[in-house]
Amino acid sequence: MKIIVVLAVLMLVSAQVCLVSAAEMGHSSDNELSSRDLVKRFFLPPCAHKGTCGKRSIESSEGANGGE
């Protein structure tokens, strides 16, 4: 079972590398944007889609400061 999980992760990583290289090689801005959108859609954490990643880090740092 663990072998299947490892293979699945390796396939996802290789797919990401292919998308990134395709975005870098593409000369058309449309192709670059679509490839970047795919990378963002599939390989970034969910908070990145909502734009809350920065807010979370700010809130957590404020909570840490308030706790002290």
UniProtKB/Swiss-Prot annotation:
Compartments it resides in: Secreted
Record's GO cellular component terms: extracellular region
Residues of the propeptide: 16-41, 57-68
Secretion signal span: 1-15
GO BP, one annotated term: defense response
Organs and tissues of expression: Expressed by the skin glands.
Modification type Cysteine amide: residues: C53
Keywords recorded for this protein, A-Z: Amidation, Amphibian defense peptide, Cleavage on pair of basic residues, Disulfide bond, Secreted, Signal
Domain of life: Eukaryota
Disulfide cross-links: C47-C53
Major site of localization recorded for this protein: secreted
Protein name as it appears in the record: Riparin-1.5 amide
